Amino acid sequence: MSVQAWTIFLAFLLFPVAVCGYECYVTPCTRDVIIVVDGSSSMQTSTYISQEINVITKLTYSWTLDYSKVRLALVGAYFGNEFNGLDYFTDSSLVEKRLQSFRLAAMQYGLFNGDFNTTVRFLDERYVGQRANFGPRTNVQKRIVIFTSHSGEKDIASTKNTLQKFGQLGYSVTLVGIGVSEDVYKNTYYHKFVTIQWFELGSVAQSIIDTITEEGICFLDQGWTTPKQEICTTTPTTTRAPTTTTKKSTGTVKPATTPKPVPPTHAPFPVGDYQDCSCTTQSLYIDIVFVVDVSEGMGLGGLMMVKAEINTLVGQMSLDPEIQKHVQVGLIKYSNESEIVFKPSEYTNEDEFTEDLWTDPRLEDVDEKTDEVNLHLALQQAAKMIGSMRKGVKKVVVIYAASYNDEGDDDARQIAANIRESGYEIITVAFVEPESSSLVMKIGELASPRMNFTSFRDELLVDELEDALCQVNCYCPNGWKQLVLEDRKYGECFFPTKIDASWTATKFECPILSKEHTGNGHLVYVNSALKNTFLNKFYMDHWDPENQEKPNYDIGLSYDKATQKYIWVNGVTNNPYSNWAEGHPNLSKGECVMSKQEAGTTTDFKWNSINCQTDSGRGLCQEAACDSDFYCPPN
């Protein structure tokens, strides 16, 4: 697939054939759109600018650009301390290259001071005014979308007259405020204001993209009416919108669409008050190998989206080996052959990695000479690379694939199984078009549990991938068993004590057993039937009948005389779950609690009251997992 893949999303986004107040929902959509990218020091860092560009990529990468339809002009404000604004694009492939040049300028030259007034004056001189270099088409609705982080109220207020003139000339201006509130812009003039908070910039919700599209671009200007619905003809090689035929009907006419493939179905996460693994991307301590499909099936637009996603992910991590918790990253590209692009040892700075991600000629375009792929070969290289990385550090292979072949020597299933059996995780992202539903299930076969994802080319999966990487980064100290429920890892680890002792003695033993980690170990907290079953099975698996008569274990529950309540050692008093044996609790037998195996069963345990001082047994200790909050040295 070529750059023409960019056109598909907007065809569905902008061209439904329902009669409404949005002309873009009728074929054909015609707009002249100007988008301003803020590259000033108000954006704070080049990482934020890169994320801003990712948002614009997500907004525009599938638009159908054509002189008779949508034209798009991109303005770079203060990149390299200057303004960059060329004529309207009618070729989608040039859009991403232009955005890429802005991204690189921010990384290479740094950020420069700027103001909102100068940005507006540039628009007036270059695009809007009577002497503009690049004027609009006649009888076409005109839109300006300004991404801005400027916050000087006097500076902003000084643009009111100019922006009012824009409106009088037919330009509707939408302001996308990054890290600033609409109140700062109350003294200027605009059609729509959309806010993106700094913390949202790395993974902007689709609802924000939809708002910009629908209320900033696709609405109808006053005096414009919905034109007659037309047939948009298409051939297999055109970049036009999909064919939509209007039929006589008394109801609403709907467009002919191709259903999207069903994404991999992950069961909902278990319901319960379990300790999640902490997930601070900057504090990850893992090794990552990205494996990227650059075959014709990916298309240039797809490759740029993959790079944007990798940029966003790695840009939030630390690659500095001087920092205790840091990441090593490698990258392999493949089509019918594979090639190592970045070796893990080459980068100690995330900015250097992301800059090379956009400048390395090996990642500038897809391989249009072939639509064949050999993921098996790429995974062989990935296995060798990841095996040579840091010892004792958790590792993951992240596969981005737009095509897949599971036949003959190209079958990647066995090598993927070998990677997983070596203790490494595999994340798959099926980067698909609507007709590629078979790819979803097939590429997902290679993934670790709950780590197969699907991108429909109209959204980044940053949140999902961050969570998956944090799952890789979540594990237990040596000898401890992690809580895993329905293939979801949690930040809870368990360890059985090895000698018989009273409940009170065991209570003090747990912190000692965890002293090499957090030192906050305690007798186990049982708060669901699902967790109870997990713990019973774990204890039975580690029960030594020769040294312990029965597989009973102390839990962290005891009666508090002062409050006259049962309290867990972690302070919980309102645990909704209980598992008392018949006739219990029974204070006459004691104030502490042991989980005892029911007679005639192997895995059925019930809670029994015991004497805290005289009844002896083993305990089951609980401790926090190693994750982005709690560091564990390499094993």
UniProtKB/Swiss-Prot annotation:
Record keywords: Disulfide bond, Lectin, Repeat, Secreted, Signal
Region (Disordered) location: 233-263
Stretches assigned to the C-type lectin domain: 489-621
Lineage: Eukaryota, Metazoa, Ecdysozoa, Nematoda, Chromadorea
Gene3D superfamilies: Mannose-Binding Protein A, subunit A, von Willebrand factor, type A domain
One of the record's GO molecular function terms: carbohydrate binding
Record-linked CDD domains: CLECT (cd00037), vWFA (cd00198)
Domain VWFA: 32-215, 287-472
Disulfide bridge map: C592-C612
PANTHER family: C-TYPE LECTIN, C-TYPE LECTIN DOMAIN-CONTAINING PROTEIN 160
Signal peptide: 1-21
Biased composition (Low complexity): 233-257
Protein name: C-type lectin protein 160
InterPro entries: C-type_lectin-like, C-type_lectin-like/link_sf, CTDL_fold, VWF_A, vWFA_dom_sf
Localization in the cell: Secreted
An example Gene Ontology CC term for this record: extracellular region
One Pfam family per UniProt: VWA
